[in-house]
Curated annotation (Swiss-Prot):
List of residues binding Mg(2+): 74
GO terms classed as biological process: nucleotide metabolic process; purine nucleoside triphosphate catabolic process
Cysteine-cysteine disulfides: none
Keyword Magnesium assigned: yes
Complex formation: Homodimer.
Source taxonomy: Bacteria, Pseudomonadati, Pseudomonadota, Alphaproteobacteria, Hyphomicrobiales
Protein residues bound to substrate: 13-18, 75, 163-166, 186, 199-200
PANTHER family: INOSINE TRIPHOSPHATE PYROPHOSPHATASE, INOSINE TRIPHOSPHATE PYROPHOSPHATASE/HAM1 PROTEIN
Listed name of the protein: dITP/XTP pyrophosphatase
Record: active site: 74
Function field: Pyrophosphatase that catalyzes the hydrolysis of nucleoside triphosphates to their monophosphate derivatives, with a high preference for the non-canonical purine nucleotides XTP (xanthosine triphosphate), dITP (deoxyinosine triphosphate) and ITP. Seems to function as a house-cleaning enzyme that removes non-canonical purine nucleotides from the nucleotide pool, thus preventing their incorporation into DNA/RNA and avoiding chromosomal lesions.
Length: 215
């Protein structure tokens, strides 16, 4: 498994919320980072059918265009009662005709589907967030790191922190949704300290221990 020798890394995302979270996680490692948006890179079409495929598409596109290693996160929400949907298509569920994303409408769509099948109890609303982090190099080499967190889909949404589906995700064993947690509480992890909570922090801990050669 490679290391990031030159300490330069491109974050392959145009999602402001995701960029902020990744930047927070990367901060302790002394890397010089730039985002795909800052560099004016186009957003590649996510044509993959798995989190791994879409993470690679984004990371390799940025690496190829910059000549630097690039990190991408592809993540989504899997709801058991909906046979794992929306899954890899989570972000697409929020996509509007004008190209913007409305996550409140997306959350409402999931709630309507759960209501339609009679999934009213918390025990019927089990779900999880999945994160796959890919770091790709210009020569097409890639490393992957996986994370997940179990919880329940709650309604109505609670909290105005975080982004995406955070307000409707209640992690197992907690009273607050991700939307009610600070970034630090949501991640639940710092270098050499604590066990990670969020799916993204779980994946990043593996990245830190293996690719960044830290523990």
């Amino acid at each position: 498994m490679r290391s990031i020798a030159n300490k330069k890394l491109v974050i392959a995302t145009h999602n402001i919320g995701k960029l902020q979270e990744i930047t927070t996680l990367v901060a302790p490692f002394g890397l010089t980072i730039q985002s795909a948006k800052e560099l004016g890179l186009p957003e590649p079409k996510e044509t993959g059918t798995t989190f791994e495929e879409n993470a690679y598409i984004k990371a390799f596109a940025a690496a190829k265009n910059t000549g630097l290693p690039a990190l991408s996160d592809d993540s989504g929400l899997e709801v058991d009662a909906l046979n794992g949907a929306p899954g890899v298509y989570t972000a697409d569920l929020a996509l509007q005709s004008d190209g913007t994303r409305d996550f409140l409408k997306a959350m409402q769509k999931i709630e309507e589907k759960l209501q339609k099948i009679g999934a009213h109890k918390k025990s019927q609303r089990k779900c999880r967030f999945i994160s796959v982090i890919c770091i790709a190099w210009p020569d097409a080499h890639a490393d992957y790191f996986h994370g997940r967190v179990e919880g329940s889909f709650i309604w109505p949404p609670r909290g105005d922190k975080g982004f995406g589906f955070d307000p409707v995700f209640l992690p197992d064993g907690y009273k607050n949704t991700f939307g009610e947690m600070t970034t630090e509480q949501k991640h639940g992890w710092k270098l050499n300290d604590q066990t990670p909570l969020s799916h993204r922090a779980c994946a990043f801990k593996l990245l830190a221990e293996n690719l960044l050669k830290l523990s």
